[in-house]
């Protein structure tokens, strides 16, 4: 049952990622992969918040590795960074690495802290 719940969550996460990437692409291109940055940051925020909640195992599987795992994308982040390097867009590539790392860790900490504050 846990595997099925994780798969359902992942399907919703992937659909949400697709919609957010389409919305970012519709706003125009700047050379920086904003869609991927947005989904990764949002996924880290949600994962941090979920980690701080006392959730039943089934809900944790659905929302954590399911929804957040389907929403975030390390492979696309890596591919886009390599593509930027191949195009000799060094500043964009290094900015992509730094922005994803800083925003992801910061968002996870913020999610955990916010839930912790509300639960006190």
From Swiss-Prot:
<keyword id="KW-0407">Ion channel</keyword>
<feature type="transmembrane region" description="Helical">
    <location>
        <begin position="3"/>
        <end position="23"/>
    </location>
</feature>
<dbReference type="GO" id="GO:0005886">
    <property type="term" value="C:plasma membrane"/>
</dbReference>
<feature type="binding site">
    <location>
        <position position="69"/>
    </location>
    <ligand>
        <name>Na(+)</name>
    </ligand>
</feature>
<comment type="function">
    <text>Fluoride-specific ion channel. Important for reducing fluoride concentration in the cell, thus reducing its toxicity.</text>
</comment>
<dbReference type="Pfam" id="PF02537">
    <property type="entry name" value="CRCB"/>
</dbReference>
<protein>
    <recommendedName>
        <fullName>Fluoride-specific ion channel FluC 1</fullName>
    </recommendedName>
</protein>
<keyword id="KW-0915">Sodium</keyword>
<keyword id="KW-0813">Transport</keyword>
<feature type="transmembrane region" description="Helical">
    <location>
        <begin position="42"/>
        <end position="62"/>
    </location>
</feature>
<keyword id="KW-0472">Membrane</keyword>
<dbReference type="GO" id="GO:0140114">
    <property type="term" value="P:cellular detoxification of fluoride"/>
</dbReference>
<keyword id="KW-1133">Transmembrane helix</keyword>
<dbReference type="InterPro" id="IPR003691">
    <property type="entry name" value="FluC"/>
</dbReference>
<comment type="similarity">
    <text>Belongs to the fluoride channel Fluc/FEX (TC 1.A.43) family.</text>
</comment>
<keyword id="KW-0406">Ion transport</keyword>
<dbReference type="GO" id="GO:0046872">
    <property type="term" value="F:metal ion binding"/>
</dbReference>
<keyword id="KW-0812">Transmembrane</keyword>
<feature type="binding site">
    <location>
        <position position="72"/>
    </location>
    <ligand>
        <name>Na(+)</name>
    </ligand>
</feature>
<keyword id="KW-1003">Cell membrane</keyword>
<keyword id="KW-0479">Metal-binding</keyword>
<dbReference type="GO" id="GO:0062054">
    <property type="term" value="F:fluoride channel activity"/>
</dbReference>
<feature type="transmembrane region" description="Helical">
    <location>
        <begin position="99"/>
        <end position="119"/>
    </location>
</feature>
């Amino acid at each position: 049952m846990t595997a099925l719940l994780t798969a359902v969550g992942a399907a919703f996460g992937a659909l949400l990622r697709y919609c957010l990437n389409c919305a970012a692409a519709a706003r125009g291109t700047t050379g920086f992969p904003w869609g991927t940055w947005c989904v990764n940051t949002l996924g880290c925020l949600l994962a941090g918040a979920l980690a701080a909640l006392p959730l039943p195992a089934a809900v944790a599987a659905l929302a954590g590795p399911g929804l957040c795992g389907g929403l975030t994308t390390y492979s696309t982040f890596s591919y886009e960074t390599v593509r930027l390097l191949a195009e000799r867009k060094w500043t964009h590539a290094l900015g992509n690495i730094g922005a994803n790392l800083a925003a992801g860790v910061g968002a996870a900490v913020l999610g955990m802290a916010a839930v912790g504050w509300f639960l006190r």
